[in-house]
C-alpha cells in the first residue's frame, strides 16, 4: 500500500506526453504527425485509462483503510524560506481523479468522431491532454501554491478550448469574456492565499488548518482580517464555478466545440471551484459568516440559473444555465456543511450532464445535415422537433439524462439532490423553499428542452415556409469562420444533397464522391401543399457508433452511480459506500448528516421532492406539447396567451419572466453599461488628458523654445552689433520693470 502511494505523484504527468509530443511533432514533422493523428487519439485514451485504474485502486484502498496520505519535498531557497511541493491523496482526491478520467476518456472517444473533419483535430487533442493534466495536478496538490499554479493552467486550457474556433468573432469574444471574468476571481484567490500565509506562515493544507484553528480558538488573530482572507479565497471558486455574480462567462463558453462543453461542465473547470471549496472547508467551517455567505451565494445561483434557463432557444445555453443552477446546489450544500451531499451531487451531476451535452452534440451533428454548419441554426431548438423517430438512441439517452436531472428515482441525481433538499430544510426554511421550488423549475425547463427537441414534427422546413423572409444562410469553415454562402434556390437549406442520384455534396470537402446504396435508398419527403415549388427534404440520421458508445456508457453511469450513496440502512446492511469513502472528512465536517433508518423514512422524505419534479414535468408537457398548426406555440409566452387570453395581468407577468430569462436577467446588459461603458469613458478621458494636456504641455514648451530660437536667430543675423543691441535692450527692459516695482513700494 505504501509502495502504491509512493508513486502517486506521477498521476498528473501520465497524460502529459501526448500534448508535448503533438506540439513538437507539429513544429518539426507536421506531415508525419498529421498522418498519424488517429494514433494520438489512441495514446491519449490509453494514458488516461492508466490514470483511471490507478485512481480506482487508490479509492478501494481508502475505503478499506480510511487513510490520508501526504508526501512533501522541500526546496530550500535560503536559510529563511523554503518552498515545499508534493502530493496529497485523500478520498476527495481519489473521487475527483476517477471523475476526471472516466468522463475524460468518454469525451476523447466521442471527440474522435465529432472533430474528425476539423482541421484543428490535433490541436484539439493537445489541448485536451493538457487540460486533463492540469485538472489532475489540481486535485493532487498538497499546498495552496500548487493549487494556484494548476488552477491557472486549468483556466488557460479552458480559454483555449472555448476560443478553439478563434476566427469566429463570437468565439473569440466568449474566450475573452471567460478570461476577464475569471481574472477577478483568480486575483481574489491570490490575495486570499497571500493573506493566509501572512497569518499562518504555511501553504500546506494540514498545517494550515491546524494553525488556523488554533489561532481562532486562542483569539490570537484579528477575526475581521481572517474573515476577509477567507472570503477572498472564496472569490476564486465564485468565478470558476460560475456563481452569481461572476457567472456571465458560462453561457458564452458554449461557443467552443460540444465535447469541450461536456468536459468543462462535468469534470473540469466548473468542478474545480467546488473542489477547492470542499478542500478548504475545514478552514471555512470555523467562520460562520463565511459559511453563510457560501450558502447565500449558492441559493441565489440555484434560483437565478433556473430562471435564466426557462426561455433559452439554444440547446447548449439551456444546458449551461442548468449547470449553473446545479453548481449552486453544490455550493449551497457546502455552505450548510453538508460535505457528503455536495460531493455526491458533484458526482451524479457530472455523469448526467456529460450525457446531456454529448446527446446535444449528437443532435447538433444530425441537424447540420439539414440547416448547415451554423450554430445559430443547428443548436436552435425552435428548428428542431420530431427527432424521436430519426435519432432514437440519442433520444433515449437524452431522456434518461433529463429525468436524472429532474430528480426522478432511481436515477443518479435523485439521490444526491434529495439529500441537499433535506439538509436545506434543517438549515433554513427560506433556503429550503427556494431550493424545492427550483427543483420544480429544473424539471420544467429540462422537459421543455426535451419536448422542443424530440416531440412533434421537424420544424426546420415549416419555418422556411412561414411566409417570413429567411435570413441569409451562413456556414462555418473548418476553422470556424463565418462565411456567407450563396445557395442554389433549388437546393433549399440542405447542404448534403444528392446530385444525379450518384454523387453527393460534402460540406467538408469541395470534391464530390459517390454515395452508397443505403444513403440512396433513404426516405425523403416532398412538400407540395405550401403553394411553392416542390422540394425534397433530407431528415436527420442517428450518429455513428463512436458517438453513441460514450453516450451509452454514460447512460449506465446515470442509471447506477447513485447506488454508491444510497442513504439508508436495512437489516444491518450498510449500502452507503460513499460515506465509507469519505469517513475521515465526514467525521470532521458533516454535522447535518442523518442517515435514513428504514424504507419508510426514506420514502417519506423523497416523496415531496419527486412530487415537485413531476409537477414541473406536467406543466412543461401542458405548455410545450406539440402544436402542429403553428410554430408560435413553441414559446412559453404564447402558450400562456393561448390558454389565458383574458388574463392580462397574468400575461404581463409571464411576459416579464420570459423577457427576464431570454435577456439573461439583464445582468450582462448591466455589466456592459456600468462597467464596460464606464471603463471605455474613463479610457477616452485618460486618452484625451494624455494627448491634449500632458503631451500639449510638453510639446508646447518645445514649440515655444523653437520659435524663440528662430526669432532670435533672424533678429540677431549672426552679427556682434545685433547681439549687443539685444543684450542692452533686455537689460533696459529689466531695469525699467525693476524701477517701477521699486517706486510702487514707496
UniProtKB/Swiss-Prot annotation:
One of its GO terms (molecular function) is quinone binding. InterPro entries: NADH_UbQ_OxRdtase_chlpt_su5_C, NADHpl_OxRdtase_5_subgr, ND/Mrp_TM, NU5C-like, Proton_antipo_N. It is found in: Plastid, Chloroplast thylakoid membrane. Its main location: plastid. PANTHER family: NADH-UBIQUINONE OXIDOREDUCTASE CHAIN 5 (PTHR42829:SF2). NDH is composed of at least 16 different subunits, 5 of which are encoded in the nucleus. This is NAD(P)H-quinone oxidoreductase subunit 5, chloroplastic. The lineage of its organism: Eukaryota, Viridiplantae, Streptophyta, Embryophyta, Tracheophyta.
